[in-house]
């Protein structure tokens, strides 16, 4: 999406796929923009996508607390923004980090009416090696012993995750902040 021709071609191809398959929308999940140029290109791609799709389709983007700085115009162009408040680092899982990440997005200018807070249903290794495992695996192996549990040893590695109480608390926080959803 680094040039106008590529953005136009990409948006037109997406529209063809939506029409052909009778889909109602698209979510762009271009993660890990790092430079101002990458943010600018992503923002321009978002604007081009909305221009080509018009208002007929639901159009959202997925952002992450370490890479969320799309332009104000791009924010305005989407129907909602999924905000991935988790991983790949274990430091992203605690409630305090989740709350500060939400506040950071709101302070940046993402309207609460467009912000959908994401929570994980997987765990990451506590040692920072970034191995992941589905929460279902922990349940299936009988490792979940209660709703307050947020850590488990699985196949020799210690994983952190959001247990039931954390998911409940994060959902309550999103509701209290009047976000679009979870």
Predicted regions and their residues:
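Short flexible/disordered coil segments
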Residues: 49, 56-59, 86-90, 117-128, ...
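A structural motif corresponding to the C-terminal end of an alpha-helix
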Residues: 20-23, 52-57, 77, 104-114, ...
């Amino acid at each position: 999406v680094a040039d106008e021709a590529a953005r136009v071609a990409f948006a037109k191809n997406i529209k063809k796929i939506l029409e052909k398959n009778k889909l109602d929308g698209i979510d762009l999940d271009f993660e890990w923009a790092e430079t101002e140029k990458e943010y600018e290109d992503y923002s321009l791609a978002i604007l081009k996508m909305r221009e080509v799709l018009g208002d007929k389709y639901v159009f959202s983007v997925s952002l992450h607390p370490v890479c969320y700085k799309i332009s104000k115009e791009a924010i305005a162009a989407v129907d909602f923004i999924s905000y991935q408040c988790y991983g790949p680092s274990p430091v992203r899982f605690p409630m305090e980090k989740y709350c500060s990440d939400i506040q950071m997005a709101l302070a940046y200018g993402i309207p609460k009416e467009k912000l959908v807070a994401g929570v994980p249903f997987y765990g990451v290794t506590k040692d920072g090696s970034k191995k992941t495992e589905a929460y279902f695996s922990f349940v299936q192996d009988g490792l979940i012993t209660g709703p307050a549990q947020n850590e488990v040893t699985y196949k020799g590695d210690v994983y952190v995750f959001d247990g039931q109480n954390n998911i409940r608390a994060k959902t309550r926080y999103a509701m209290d902040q009047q976000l679009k959803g979870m």
